[in-house]
Amino acid sequence: MKAVQISRFGGPEVLEIVGLPTPRPARGQILVRVHAAGVNYFEVLMRSDRYAITPALPMRPGVEVSGIVEAAGEGVASGMLGTRVALPTFAFGISSGGYAEYVAVDADSVLPLPDTLSFADAVALQVQGLTALHLSRLRSVTDKTVVVTAAAGGVGSLLVQLLKAAQARKVVALTSSQAKQELALSLGADYTVSYADSNWAATVHKALRAADLIVDLVGGALTRSCLPALAPGGEIVFAALGRFDLSSEEVDGMLANNQALSGFALLPRLAPSTVKAELLELFHQATSGRLKVVLGGGFSLERVGEAHRAIESRETVGKVVLYPHGDG
């Protein structure tokens, strides 16, 4: 089978296609033909050794896939053969291997896909869907003004919708282009501003007063630009692992204004006993029309470098997906 491997850190060119034996499912395992594999920004950072944790090399990226069960090992019910499934491998301790034509996993780590949910949408609702779901429930947002950075991205586009459903008074979408602002509005954002406007925080103040909560999915210098938009007593939830850039003086200033700064990481919040129920909830919201999945581009396995370049240049919206068998 074909798979993507990283043997050295660097640009998208270090993503190489390698030939590997197709896995044989062991006892209790299934072999899944991968129809869609998710591409995430943290994988872009890992590839270039800019992530909070340096992965061991060689590595095969990919932590979320969807596909069809093609073979089963001993002890697995034969009824699983041919079923459409989602594999949130990251939630079950498997941190690599999804950028491939096939994966072998424990049968109890997958969940069935509704017939009306596409493979690509199922992938979009895994890492990014769960992140958005947990962020939307981290604090009560009822009657509050919430700013979401990168609001047209894979997490942001879902979070905007979930915050509105959770009765946020106003959801402000911070994006990088006019097209992305229009997308955020179509998803339910009440107000949009652009990173390109250096006075965006003042614009938010003038239109809506200050924000009670800011969910920062970007980090770096953008976190600093969020401070003037935050109300006294407000909170920034920092969900951009490895990209924290506030100085101690700026944090002291927040404390003086009774403002809070909270970190957010998805994996410590996930439990194998509940993650399937959470994903099934997201799948139901998507198939019932209450949650719109935004797809930002599909690429063959051979074009994985282009997928990483598109994400890195912030050209994309929503979820970027690989189609290892050209099913997209």
Model-derived segments and spans:
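Glycine-rich beta-strand-centered segment in the early N-terminal region that forms part
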Residues: 21-39, 50-91
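Mid-domain Rossmann-like dinucleotide-binding core that forms the NAD(H)/NADP(H) cofactor-binding site
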Residues: 80, 122-197
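N-terminal Rossmann-like NAD(P) cofactor-binding module of classical short-chain dehydrogenase/reductase
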Residues: 86, 212-215
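A structural motif shared across PLP-dependent enzymes of the aminotransferase-like
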Residues: 93-107
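Short, glycine/polar-rich helix-capping loops at beta-to-alpha or helix-loop-helix junctions
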Residues: 98-99, 175-183, 246-251
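Short amphipathic alpha-helix with an adjacent loop that forms part of the alpha/beta core around
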Residues: 199-209
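Glycine-rich phosphate-binding loop and adjacent beta-alpha segment
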Residues: 221-290, 324-328
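C-terminal capping/lid region of NAD(P)-dependent oxidoreductase domains
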Residues: 290-297, 305-328
